[in-house]
Regions:
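A short, aliphatic-rich alpha-helical micro-motif
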Residues: 19, 190-191, 241
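Structural beta-sheet core signal
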Residues: 30, 50, 169-171, 198, ...
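A glycine-rich beta-strand to alpha-helix segment
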Residues: 232-263
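Short glycine-centered segments of the SAM/dcSAM-binding site in methyltransferase folds
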Residues: 27, 195, 246
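Glycine/threonine-rich flexible loop motifs
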Residues: 2-9, 178-180, 206-209, 257-259
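Acidic, Mg2+-coordinating active-site environments of NTP-dependent enzymes
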Residues: 1-141, 164, 215-219
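Glycine-rich phosphate-binding loop signature in dinucleotide/nucleotide-binding domains
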Residues: 108, 159-165, 240-245
């Protein structure tokens, strides 16, 4: 939310202040893989537990294996096994999410076996790599809410691990100010697609007073396309997607409409 925070230091300071609101007898859980999260927790006089893949983390994964982007691992707490997890949601970022959940579960003295069973049974939430269906030729259609470059990279990296022939991503940027402020980061993230298809920017609460358009992103990303309407995007994807491809709609606006047009046979 760069329309509110001045810069990264301002964001870190805000999270530091948030940590200080934790009750004195409470717990602060921090991602040890994220240097900025660790900065936010510096000087916080509360009990702190860290999770991540770095050796210094209190809660770490061991015996990691992956199959088509889905992670299995043993959760270690202070070097001792707590539980085993085989995730039904893809991506390294979801392994980190599971470690965060295990950190809190261990602190609350929950039974490790049941925690592992619960995490392994979790199949995801709406608009987070949500499978919408398939095109007639079998290409999978998935929707994801990612709209910040770091989220986009995590989702696209997960898609890359899933052994699709190609990743075709229809992305709807969210707000003009964010698109302008993070333009280079959006370009880098979209380069992870085989084909990026850009929809017009979702304005939300804004008016375009800074002269930025989705077509600017499309011009900066190799092999990217820009279309003015969802109908044009859906038509392009129907013609372009092949068996073995992933069609991914991405954004925090209403880009999921395209996914439903492809899988429900709707025309909008």
């Amino acid at each position: 939310h760069l329309d509110f925070f001045k810069d990264l230091d301002d964001i870190i300071h805000s999270f530091h202040e948030f940590c200080l609101r934790t009750p004195k007898d409470g717990l602060v859980v921090v991602n040890a893989d994220d240097a900025n999260a660790m900065r936010a927790a510096q000087g916080v006089d509360r009990e702190i537990l860290t999770f991540g893949t770095v050796e210094t983390a209190d809660v770490r994964p061991a015996d990691i294996s992956t199959k088509n982007g889905y992670y299995s691992f043993t959760v270690m707490v202070h070097g001792e096994p707590y539980t085993k997890v085989t995730l039904a949601v893809p991506g390294r970022h979801n392994m980190l999410n599971a470690l965060a959940a295990c950190t809190v579960s261990w602190y609350l003295k929950l039974d490790g076996a049941r925690v592992g069973e619960g995490l392994s049974a979790f199949t995801g939430s709406s608009r987070r790599f949500q499978k919408l269906g398939n095109l007639p030729n079998g290409a999978l259609v998935v929707d994801d809410y990612a709209h910040h470059p770091s989220e986009m990279r995590a989702t696209l990296a997960a898609a890359r691990e899933m052994n699709f022939d190609r990743v075709l991503c229809a992305f709807q940027p969210h707000t003009y100010t964010r698109t302008k402020a993070l333009f280079p980061e959006f370009v880098d993230a979209l380069k992870l697609c085989d084909i990026a298809i850009l929809a017009p920017i979702y304005a939300a609460r804004e008016k375009n007073t800074i002269g930025i358009e989705s077509s600017d992103l499309a011009a900066a990303v190799p092999n990217a396309k820009f279309f003015q309407s969802f109908a044009e995007i859906a038509d392009f994807l129907r013609a372009e997607a092949k068996p073995g491809d992933l069609v991914l709609t991405m954004g925090a606006g209403n880009i999921d409409t395209v996914g439903h047009m492809l899988t429900d046979g709707a025309s909008q």
